[in-house]
């Protein structure tokens, strides 16, 4: 999953400039043409390079509305586009719609290709099954959480790429918003919290992961997002853990976590002490 994040968030993608940052004010969806889906299913692949070439050849700006992993119903608008030249003929517009529609590959199931949320959902499903009463395998769940840790770390340090894509001449051609950090964090933490909070070992392990991520994060908003997830996890653990000792352990970890997040020097000392943050060697 981490390698997929690296491929979806390349460092070379350009950033928005003054002209593109306020595109919503100049290019209104009400004035755009729409490309509707001919049938329903999951978006499995989006041919980004072809979209840019189509936009360049017809002098368009294309706004993608569905990304890989989204479920699309017949008639939904897959993309909008604006003509930068004079209005084309009806036949030309029909050809443009067909070309753009062909860039969206659809199927009955989601796939891993271009879809980082699919991988996150798969791990959450494995974790949930591992912690179900009939299985009760917290070690498999902890293994899933370790991969969550790696992926969240990669997301937290990555620069979210601009949604604006340019052709070789430097003209903006395609607008396609990536999966945000907040969305990715929510998919992992919000979907798994109920299961994680019900077991002492997994609850404490996830607390340590969120503490380490928050304490080591240099992005203020993302740091607070990690802390917020820690708060939610502790609140859930308070209501779901049954044993008095387990509740005391959760409380002790949470109180120490708040101190570590607030004081970077304490974070370093805790790592060096080889207790519950960082490695154990």
Whereabouts are the PLM-identified features?
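Inter-helical turn/loop segments and adjacent helix faces that build the functional surface
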Residues: 85
